[in-house]
Amino acid sequence: MRFRKRRYIKIEPKEKIEIKKDNWFKCEQCGKLLYKKKWQENLKVCPHCGKYGRMSAMERINMLADTDSFKELWGDMVSGDPLNFMGVKGYKEKLAEEMQKTGCKEAIITGECKIGGVPCVVAAIDANFIMGSMGSVVGEKFTRAVEYVLEKKYPFISVSGGGGGARMYEGAISLMQMAKTAAVTGKLKQAGVLYVSVLTDPTMGGIAASFAFLGDIILAEPGALIGFAGPRVIEQTIRQKLPSDFQRTEFLFEHGMIDIISKRAELKDNISKILKILYT
């Protein structure tokens, strides 16, 4: 018995599509694989478990400001090295590395914009630049932003997201910025100018202990770490086990430290409502 030879259709392979490993990553919380582009389009929130990723200062401003309304102020200011600090690396070398890595000149971006059609002044901290630590330029730009607000009588919006506290490279000059920013923020209350403070993960150290908690209205994203010293440091000091949600947004809300817990996607709308009620 003879068998016919099967005929096979030859399919020419198409050009290979290269999928870069950098385009995918695992969620820190649920371990699901996420496509970076989709994750960024979702405002860096995991679609599976809702874990919030950290955003840069410019990403924050782009999310909040009306399209093409943001104008940066004092963007050319950079830190000096008053102490000629030398550690593993010199301060000047560290600053140069951070500028190249983040595309920012400092850990804060300040400027004016419109949010829901209302003119505002915004100051956003970038945790990617030396952990969002507060040095002389951060304090000076924040102070100038508040003084500009007092002149224009616009609402002031600060977005805090820095866990680095005072910047050790600048010593006492850095510590002084806590008093400086807190003092100038007090002038907003005296002038009756609206100050909305937005707390994001992480809002810690000198930023939490100065201007971040001085807003007339304080909003925070869900699950953000907010406090002065970290929970492990506190546990070691008081020798007691802290609640699992200690220093998280929800814990602070329950204890009256925060006015509104706002999802990231709803943050602009919530701020717009506040501005329309209390400013316009």
Describe each PLM feature range:
Residues 163-279:
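Conserved catalytic cores of soluble enzyme domains
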Residues 118, 124-136:
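STAS-typified acidic loop motif
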Residues 101-107, 132-147:
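Glycine-rich anion/phosphate-binding loops
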Residues 106-110, 119, 154-155, 193:
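Short glycine-rich loop/turn motifs
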Residues 36, 131-134, 166-170:
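A generic structural signal for short coil/turn motifs at secondary-structure boundaries
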